[in-house]
Amino acid sequence: VCGNVVIGENSFISKYNMNAWGYSDDNSSVVEHGVDIDFWKPDENIDRDNACLSVVNDWPNRDWCCGYNLWQQTVQGLPIKVFGKSPGLSEPASSTEHLREIYQSSRIFYNTSLHSPVPTVLLEAMACGCAIVSTANCMIPEIIENGKNGLISNDPQELRGFLQLLLKDEDLAKELGDNARKTIVEKYNLEKFVDNWNNLLHSTVNNYRNK
């Protein structure tokens, strides 16, 4: 089951998923995703393009979950960069290193996901210091505090306004990007992800042995 692993107790990738399945902290655990902060990191030697980056595979055919129509509606006339395997729209990065460079060279990362527990590209972009503009669906409000480490809304006009603001205000984009990186380092790093899983597995084994 997506977002749910049964190993003696219920484990979820976010509080959003846990609540959606009708569970609580009393009978479940949350193990949040993590990314490698030593790999996904800013490069101060790379200038950032003043454009809105999005990274999505098969985007037009996944409008229901990835918000392709919302993206079209909100970026009209704005400078954009799109990567991902979407024939007729965009090509994927040639390698993981290339994808990292794409994040590192982008001022703004724009995420329009409508139904996604944890968009991994969002975490990667945050780790690379991009200023985030995103919808406020599923787990995203657990990751992004609006105005502190990104800008989130489900209102198309407000999302477009956020993009326009960051295109004009490089200092604000830098501040939000730095705070986004800090969030990943402190809460969504790979080491913490592995440690949390190990602790959960050890706890489950010990509870089983004591029964």
Protein language model annotation of sequence segments:
Residues 20-23, 36-90:
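Conserved catalytic-core segment of nucleotide-activated headgroup transferases in glycan assembly
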Residues 100, 119-127, 141-142, 148:
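Short alpha-helical segment that forms part of, or immediately flanks, the ligand-binding pocket
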Residues 101-106:
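Short alpha-helical donor nucleotide-sugar binding micro-motif in glycosyltransferases
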Residues 107, 129:
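A short alpha->beta transition loop at the rim of the catalytic pocket in nucleotide-sugar-dependent
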Residues 114:
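Aromatic "clamp/platform" in nucleotide-sugar-dependent glycosyltransferases that forms part
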Residues 131-134:
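Short hydrophobic beta-strand element within catalytic cores of glycosyltransferases
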Residues 165, 172-187, 193-199:
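A short, well-ordered alpha-helix in the C-terminal region of glycosyltransferases
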